[in-house]
């Protein structure tokens, strides 16, 4: 055989340029790029070196022959003309892979059969024996690629694809192939940063692919050094002495690299199910001293290298599957950008994404972008320098999803209308309440509170402030009240509110509050889709003032949510009838070990998912769409802290029967208490004004009414807004 060969290296689409540069550095000459491949010329030593050292290639193919063909007979004759006794024992095993079509070959399976027949017939006619087919681990794997009438016949020197390094036996739901991860690291400048002694951190590391590939680059470890079976292992053209030379050189370089002080390489992953698989992958790669993986949310990401060195933050955020919708994904990118700006000053950052438009929501300018493909999905690698001059001013406004409202300075009317005497009295009451409650709200870090609740009988309204928006609920007037007078007073109030509070009339939202039947309480009232971000006790929550009767945040339960935040540390939290899971967000903020939230409404669970994502909390917080009673009957888990705030009345196509809180609360609480761990606490609350707790519950459990403790100053005037109890096992 010749001492010089044509080699054909395949790779993921988009890596051709990087692979060409890498292959030249490893000795490949006359390099030319093709779609998802490169080709060049090399001796056998270089071919071996490419196999063991290429971080980017999928396969290294040694071209045996190129020939023209017009039909299947030409294909057979071209393959049969090769002296296969130089490559494969007559009683050996082979596999054939065929790609392309044309020249009478429109079926790759048929093409592969013709190639196989040509090889088998050649050896049988010469040796009297024939090789057998072995698809998994053959002695020789033959490739034939048909391209515009030209057949390229090759031997696969690599065997299994080179991206399969052998360390990643456990992986997450959407893994990044190892050679693609290496390409992203190279494009991100990691070889340069590593050579300078820099650090690397991945805030969403999954099972650690970026971390292991980064450590192998930094420690000068050949990616396929540990591979035991190669495509050339049983090939008759194999030169074992030459291979041992190449392998021994790689082994020596790895030993020297691992003898150096390890770089600081850390990964953080929110999903506890991926932590141990990631650590196992690191150990299989022999990099336990270099790479550490911890459980952590994006919202708390803060790399702290031992020597305070800077480096590279690299991440492959989910493309939508893990979090469920685009809005949740947007908040994830927003959180990532916030953490980079707050905790990674002076670092470089690289975000590999299938949703590049979300990179613009991070509040940092990307100074370089590279196109990649992750399988069939077009992706972008966004590179950032985390420096103040790269920060985008006003990024909070940019980070809102389409249709989301942001705070603005309200336009002032040029000349306010004169108020009636009654309206002026109403305005004066609003201003008095604002002065009293505003100081309290600012001190408690509260954006939303009840400013007025039918304080004056003739103005039967609830007025809630949501930052610089006003949510007004009109209580239905009794039949004894003249409808015209009631309407006039409502119009007076609506005229007074903007003047009294100094906000635009366009920021006043009016709804009518009356007794609801069935599921009407939860039905959509409008379709504006305007979400607003508010703050409460250190957490961010989304409210929608227009589309539903309720806004997504029950203001009267604020003290209960704050109590849950204070008590949640290290506990398993269960939220039943969770609505938009605002209490769950508080529990996560308080350090809950895990949270589970159950509700029948997909709409509100999607909202809950956004609330969690907005705060950087992800899928360790379980959201279950189910009828609560049925879910409790089928659940066998234990919880340390349970919160139940059921509706007064509920029915749905998805549930059997009708839920009535007065009738069904005993069964509900018995089922929930069966899930309460020893020493745990269950909080039960509801808004039914005539509700009476069944006395038998007080005999079975330790029950304490805590209603007075769950009312903040803004609801002190209406101590019947809800009732609340604390229950424990006796």
Curated annotation (Swiss-Prot):
EC category name: transferase
Keywords: Cytoplasm, Methyltransferase, RNA-binding, rRNA processing, S-adenosyl-L-methionine, Transferase
Record GO terms (molecular function): 23S rRNA (guanine(2445)-N(2))-methyltransferase activity; RNA binding; rRNA (guanine-N7-)-methyltransferase activity
Keyword Transcription regulation set for record: no
One GO CC term, this protein: cytoplasm
Compartments in which it is found: Cytoplasm
SMART domains xrefs: THUMP (SM00981)
CDD domains: AdoMet_MTases (cd02440), THUMP_AdoMetMT (cd11715)
EC nos: 2.1.1.173, 2.1.1.264
Stretches the record annotates as Disordered: 395-418
UniProt keyword Zinc, yes or no: no
Domain THUMP, chain residue ranges per copy: 46-157
Catalysis performed (reactions): guanosine(2445) in 23S rRNA + S-adenosyl-L-methionine = N(2)-methylguanosine(2445) in 23S rRNA + S-adenosyl-L-homocysteine + H(+); guanosine(2069) in 23S rRNA + S-adenosyl-L-methionine = N(2)-methylguanosine(2069) in 23S rRNA + S-adenosyl-L-homocysteine + H(+)
Domain of life: Bacteria
InterPro entries: 23SrRNA_methyltr_KL (IPR017244), DNA_methylase_N6_adenine_CS (IPR002052), RlmKL-like_Mtase (IPR000241), RlmL_1st (IPR054170), SAM-dep_methyl-trfase (IPR019614), SAM-dependent_MTases_sf (IPR029063), THUMP_dom (IPR004114)
SUPFAM superfamilies: S-adenosyl-L-methionine-dependent methyltransferases (SSF53335)
Family the entry assigns: Belongs to the methyltransferase superfamily. RlmKL family.
Function description: Specifically methylates the guanine in position 2445 (m2G2445) and the guanine in position 2069 (m7G2069) of 23S rRNA.
Protein name: Ribosomal RNA large subunit methyltransferase K/L
Taxon lineage: Bacteria, Pseudomonadati, Pseudomonadota, Gammaproteobacteria, Pseudomonadales
